[in-house]
Amino acid sequence: MVVALAGLTLTIPDGQFLVVIGANGSGKSTLLNGIAGTFTPDTGSIIVDGVDVTNQPAYRRARYIGRVFQNPFAGTAPTMTVAENLRLAALRGLPKRPLIGLSRAFRSELQHRVAGLGMGLEDRMETPIGLLSGGQRQALTLLMATFRPPAILLLDEHTAALDPGSATKVMELTKQIVNEKKLTTLMVTHDMEQALNVGNRLLMMERGAIAMDLAEQEKSQLTIAELLARFAGGRGSVVSGQ
């Protein structure tokens, strides 16, 4: 029997962009879900920004954690407008208060932030978000997850369900936002090209444990072929990125 994450110790320094790869069932999603609060570990502790969140439910951890799922239709309210979704994101982690209308100044701020995505969505603030494409929704979900900079940003294969053009755009936005806001980030991916070209640390998981941990300089010297060779023996599918 394999006990997921048994004995695993992982520290992510402030501002580090950690990329995690591994075969299906290797423990990648379990690691991410454990941090997010999807389940409570049997032993051990989870510390986020100096706070022990081990026994906190997911909704309590929302003040510390931003998350973007693989499914572009998760993380947003499809019947609400772009502006309304962003307003909810702006209130994350703040004391509960009645929702009020959008002031002109706040609406202008939202439009400015949306314009930064480079998708022309600043002119569609009153459009229900469910009418947008998957790439547009995922870009907005990324913006919402980082509207108030989280202590850690969790990216769960967040470009895997997008067409190649949208995936490239969302990944470029990801790097831009993470770099500008100096966000501590954990990204799970099956794309070996992303694994080598994104982030400044690379982790490979196998059977619930860390099988490889490379710093930025080490991973920058690897080729996709060399990384695939290290990946050999994994049970899941791999996308080479070529």
Predicted regions and their residues:
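H-loop/switch region of ABC-family ATPase nucleotide-binding domains
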Residues: 189-190
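Helix-to-loop junction immediately C-terminal to a conserved catalytic motif
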Residues: 36
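ABC ATPase NBD coupling module
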Residues: 52-66, 74, 96-103, 220-225
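Conserved ABC transporter NBD signature motif
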Residues: 44-51, 212-214
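Conserved beta-strand-loop-alpha-helix hinge in the C-terminal portion
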Residues: 209-233
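Catalytic Walker B motif of ABC-type/P-loop ATPase nucleotide-binding domains
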Residues: 153-156
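A short, proline-enriched helix->beta-strand linker immediately N-terminal to the Walker B motif
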Residues: 147-151
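The feature captures the beta-strand-to-loop junction immediately N-terminal to the Walker
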Residues: 21-23
